[in-house]
C-alpha cells in the first residue's frame, strides 16, 4: 500500500593536480561517496577510542583506509560547516556562516492532526558562487544528495534542483530534521520527472501528533527511508558513468528516537542504570527514555548503514573505483537528553558543538580507496572541510577549478582550500600545507585560528592562546607569555575575516 503523497512547493586557493590520481586509473574517473554524519564527536567511534559503542563497519573502514587525527570541520555547527564543503571557503569568507532559519513567521499548513511550516530551510548558498555538485556535473558526473541539505530554503535560489544535483531525498531544512518521524521529507528526482523540490508526505506519521506519547506510534523512520533511497541510487549506477554521492545522514543528532529493535534492545540491556529526558517541544525534541542506550543505538545504526553501503558497492562491482569518506559536521551535542560526558564523546578535547575549541571542531575523518589509499594508515595532517573541494577536484580530474570557477564579477570571490590528495595517495612530499586554519561562529561570538601547535580562540573579542602540543585540552591561556604569537594570529584574523551583514562577530583589537 502506498503511504506517501507528494505535493509541489512554492517559496516565499589552489590549482588542481589531476596527475596525482594513480596511473592505473587511466581515463576512468573515480566515483566518490562522501558520508557526513551529524554531531558525532571525535571520541564517538571505537576506532577513535570509544569504549561503549559498537561500530564494526566503520572500524573496518579505518583498518582498510586512512584515519586522520587532526581533521577539522568547517564550523562548530551544521549549516556553515556544510557550506565550507560545498563552497570551498572558510567561515570568514563563505556566505553561510550560521544556522539562519527561514521557517519563522510563515503560515502553517495542515498535515493530518498536525500543523507544520509552509516554508522551511536555511540561508541559501550564494547562487553566484559555484558549489561542488555543479563542478561535478560539468565534469560529467551523476550527482546525488541524500540526507540534510541546509543550503537554502524551499523556493530559494539554492535548492538541490538548482545547484547541480540530479537526485535529492531528505530534509531541505535542518530544523525539520530534529524529528526522526517527520510529517514530510523533501525530494527532487529527475528520474521521477520532478522539475523542482517537492514534499513527500509521510501519510502514516501524520495520523499521530508530532509531540507526546502518541508520537511514538509513528512508524516512518526518516533515517532508514533516506538510507534506502541512497542505496537505490547507488544500485542504479554503473562503471561507465562516474558518480558522486553526498550521504548526509542526520544520525546521531537529537532527537533521541529510533525503532525498538535489536540494536536498541542490546544497549538497553547493557546500560542498566540509564537516564530519562523530558522533551523540548519548541526545539522538536520529544521525551526520551534510556538516553544512553538511545544514543549508542543511533551510532551503531549508522554503522550498520555504512556496512550496507560497502556491501552495495561490492555487489555492483564498484568498490575498487570508489573513494569513500566518512566524517562528521561538527563536535558532539548535549541536546535532546544526550550525555557526552558519559561516553567521553569529545575524545578528551575541550568544548562541544557551537564552540571553536577543539571539541567543537576536531572530528573523525576516514578515507578509503582500495589500492590507492594505504590500508591501516593513521595521519596527522592538519586540514579543514574547505580543503575537500580541491581534493575532490584533484581526484575527479577537474583541472584548474579555482581559475575556472572564480566569479570575477562577485566581489571577493575565490576559494580557500588546499588539496589533500597527495596525502591520501601516499605522496607526502608533494603535500602543500596551510599557514593556518580559520573558523568563526557568531552565535557564541568565537573565532578560532590554528597555526602548527598554536591555537587561538577569541571569545567575545578577547584572545586566548594555547599550545596544543602540551595542552590539548586548552586549559592554560599563555597569551601573555607569547605576545609575538598573539600578534601573528591576530594578523591572520584581520586578513581572513570579511564582514557579513547576517553573521556578525566581535573582532579583537588589532
Where are these regions (language model features)?
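Active-site beta-strand termini and strand-to-loop segments that position acidic
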Residues: 449-452
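Bacterial Sec-dependent N-terminal signal peptides
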Residues: 1-28
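Short Gly/Pro-enriched turn/cap motifs at secondary-structure boundaries
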Residues: 74, 125, 353-358, 411, ...
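Active-site-proximal cap/lid insertion segments
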Residues: 27-30, 37-53, 60, 69, ...
Amino acid at each position: 500500500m502506498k503511504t506517501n503523497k507528494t505535493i509541489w512547493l512554492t517559496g516565499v586557493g589552489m590549482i588542481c593536480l589531476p596527475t596525482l590520481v594513480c596511473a592505473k586509473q587511466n581515463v576512468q574517473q573515480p566515483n566518490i561517496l562522501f558520508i557526513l554524519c551529524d554531531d558525532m564527536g571525535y571520541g564517538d567511534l571505537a576506532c577513535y577510542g570509544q569504549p561503549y559503542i559498537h561500530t564494526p563497519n566503520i572500524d573496518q573502514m579505518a583498518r582498510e583506509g586512512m584515519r586522520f587525527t587532526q581533521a577539522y570541520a568547517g564550523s562548530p555547527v551544521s549549516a556553515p560547516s556544510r557550506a565550507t564543503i560545498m563552497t570551498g571557503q572558510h567561515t570568514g569568507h563563505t556566505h553561510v556562516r550560521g544556522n539562519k532559519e527561514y521557517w519563522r513567521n510563515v503560515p502553517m499548513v495542515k498535515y493530518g492532526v498536525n500543523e507544520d511550516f509552509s516554508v522551511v530551510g536555511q540561508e541559501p548558498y550564494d547562487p553566484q558562487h559555484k558549489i561542488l555538485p555543479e563542478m561535478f556535473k560539468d565534469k560529467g558526473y551523476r550527482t546525488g544528495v541524500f540526507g540534510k541539505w541546509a543550503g537554502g530554503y524551499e523556493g530559494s535560489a539554492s535548492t538541490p534542483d538548482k545547484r547541480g544535483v540530479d537526485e535529492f531525498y531528505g530534509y531541505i531544512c535542518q530544523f525539520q530534521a530534529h524529528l526522526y518521524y517527520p510529517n514530510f521529507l523533501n525530494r527532487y528526482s529527475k528520474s521521477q520527472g520532478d522539475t523542482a523540490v517537492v514534499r513527500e508526505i509521510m501519510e502514516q506519521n501524520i495520523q499521530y501528533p508530532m509531540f507526546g506519547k502518541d508520537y511514538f506510534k509513528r512508524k516512518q523512520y526518516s533515517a532508514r527511508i533516506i538510507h534506502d533511497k541512497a542505496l537505490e541510487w547507488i544500485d542504479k549506477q554503473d562503471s561507465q558513468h562516474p558518480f558522486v554521492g553526498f550521504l548526509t545522514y542526520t544520525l546521531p543528532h537529537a532527537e533521541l528516537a529510533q525503532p525498538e529493535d535489536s540494536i536498541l534492545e542490546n544497549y538497553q540491556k547493557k546500560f542498566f542504570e540509564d537516564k530519562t529526558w523530558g522533551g523540548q517541544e519548541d526545539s522538536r525534541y520529544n521525551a526520551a527514555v534510556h538516553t544512553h542506550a538511545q544514543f549508542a543505538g543511533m551510532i551503531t545504526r549508522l554503522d550498520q548503514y555504512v556496512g550496507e553501503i560497502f556491501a552495495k558497492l561490492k555487489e555492483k562491482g564498484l568498490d575498487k573505483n570508489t573513494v569513500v569518506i566518512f566524517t562528521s559536521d561538527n563536535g558532539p551535542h548535549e541536546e535532546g537528553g544526550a550525555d557526552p560526558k558519559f561516553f567521553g564523546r569529545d575524545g578528551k578535547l575541550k568544548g562541544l558543538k557551537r564552540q571553536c575549541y577543539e571539541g567543537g571542531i576536531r572530528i573523525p575523518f576516514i578515507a578509503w580507496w582500495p589500492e590507492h589509499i594505504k590500508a591501516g594508515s593513521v595521519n596527522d595532517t592538519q586540514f579543514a572541510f574547505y580543503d575537500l573541494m580541491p581534493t575532490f577536484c584533484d581526484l575527479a580530474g577537474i583541472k584548474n577549478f579555482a581559475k575556472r570557477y572564480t566569479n570575477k564579477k562577485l566581489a571577493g570571490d575565490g576559494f580557500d582550500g588546499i588539496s589533500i590528495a597527495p596525502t591520501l595517495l601516499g605522496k607526502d612530499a608533494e603535500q602543500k600545507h596551510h599557514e593556518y586554519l580559520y573558523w568563526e561562529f557568531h552565535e557564541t561570538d568565537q573565532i578560532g585560528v590554528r597555526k602548527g601547535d598554536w591555537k587561538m580562540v577569541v571569545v567575545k573579542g578577547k584572545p586566548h592562546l594555547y599550545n596544543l602540543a602540551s595542552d590539548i585540552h586548552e586549559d592554560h591561556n599563555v597569551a601573555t607569555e607569547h605576545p609575538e604569537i598573539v600578534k601573528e594570529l591576530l594578523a591572520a584574523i584581520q586578513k581572513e575575516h570579511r564582514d557579513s551583514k547576517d553573521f556578525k562577530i566581535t573582532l579583537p583589537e588589532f
